[in-house]
Amino acid sequence: MEKSWFNLMFSKGELEYRGELSKAMDSFAPSEKTTLSQDRFIYDMDKNFYGWGERSSYSTNVDLLVSSKDIRNFISDDTFFVRDGNKNSYSIYFDIKKKKFEIDNDLSDLEFFFYSYCSSSYLNNRLKGDNDLHYDPYIKDTKYNCTNHINSCIDSYFRSHICIDSNFLSDSNNSNESYIYNFICSESGKIRESKNYKIRTNRNRSNLMSSKDFDITQNYNQLWIQCDNCYGLMYKKVKMNVCEQCGHYLKMSSSERIELSIDPGTWNPMDEDMVSADPIKFHSREEPYKNRIDSAQKTTGLTDAVQTGTGQLNGIPVALGVMDFKFLGGSMGSVVGEKITRLIEYATNQRLPLILVCSSGGARMQEGSLSLMQMAKISSVLCDYQSSKKLFYISILTSPTTGGVTASFGMLGDIIIAEPYAYIAFAGKRVIEQTLKKAVPEGSQAAESLLRKGLLDAIVPRNPLKGVLSELFQLHAFFPLKKNEIK
């Protein structure tokens, strides 16, 4: 099996375990430092052995040695070997699934690793005249950039993937001061010979990406999500798909939004069995419309691009419709229009407040004029709901909201709320520029710009959104059910 070896040294401060794990993990008590016997040895880059009582020429604070297939597997390993400046040695064990964090001085499980490390062909074949600890024949002129990149990757991963306080990894607040000293590459050299790596910089943060194996969250994709702006990792439920590093708002599925807004156990879906029947027999050379529908249904688990139903929001009965951009771009076809229409009619009869969460690319072209007529149909029942029955409708615009949805029920709310940085427009930037042959000003179609021009009532982040909706409903005389009213 091919292995890569990483020799990492913390350059700032001694390793301390302060028990300051994030609330996302269980609480742990600090572990005391333990000392090993003097007969243990570590093998350095110049193939010299040092006992724990001896002083290493390159180990001033903490040495950490691990074996893995590549950097993504390295940061997913369970056990790490650490030695601090006082020559105290530790075996640090992480178990993400079981939420375990242990520090132990029994390194018997790692003996095989050290034997393998000492006999590594990469180390044994290293040039004897090379005394530069930073030297790497494959990285060459980019060696320090790659080192800084690896530092950034590991720092980002540990903070988000294991939720460790930043003080656990470094005592320095300067992001430019690296806590990793050196990075040794694979003995086969395949990693450097590959041309599938590139450096992408965003917000002064470098990220090393592989076109073959980029997603490091594969094993925990039900818990973690990767920012498509800065490529940082975050815990889905705690952060609500908002990147804690750059503040970027990631897309949420309709099911995630329902879970965010509706009280647990109160959601009652409507018209789940309604599916599109390809009413105009749309012909496409690339992929038939029915095949695209079937593929989207398998991918998302939905029957179409909207979920509708009733539930309780902080105890207040509401009618809710949530569009899902992952289903054919959230496009509005006959099924989407019919489900929203039925939801509004039900809310009218039951006198329920209405919430519609918009995320759509517009009308579905595969259904022709049938998709366009949904705009008028929904607007008509909304007129009866709002004007005749005097009921309360809140429209929530998320990124992106464009086309027919913007031109109809998206902008008809009694209160129109948008998420921060949401892209809201009728025609997209590319369409406008191609049609008018003029550049669209940057940010002119963002929620903040629309708020300044009076097209929105408020921009509300995801975290306080549920509370804001609850207050708005109570302001309009919709109150939580009493205990004896809950069926």
UniProtKB/Swiss-Prot annotation:
Keywords: ATP-binding, Chloroplast, Fatty acid biosynthesis, Fatty acid metabolism, Lipid biosynthesis, Lipid metabolism, Metal-binding, Nucleotide-binding, Plastid, Transferase, Zinc, Zinc-finger. A zinc finger (C4-type) spans 227-246. Binds 1 zinc ion per subunit. PROSITE patterns: COA_CT_NTER. One of its GO terms (cellular component) is chloroplast stroma. Residues 223-487 form the CoA carboxyltransferase N-terminal domain. Acetyl-CoA carboxylase is a heterohexamer composed of biotin carboxyl carrier protein, biotin carboxylase and 2 subunits each of ACCase subunit alpha and ACCase plastid-coded subunit beta (accD). Component of the acetyl coenzyme A carboxylase (ACC) complex. Biotin carboxylase (BC) catalyzes the carboxylation of biotin on its carrier protein (BCCP) and then the CO(2) group is transferred by the transcarboxylase to acetyl-CoA to form malonyl-CoA. This is Acetyl-coenzyme A carboxylase carboxyl transferase subunit beta, chloroplastic.
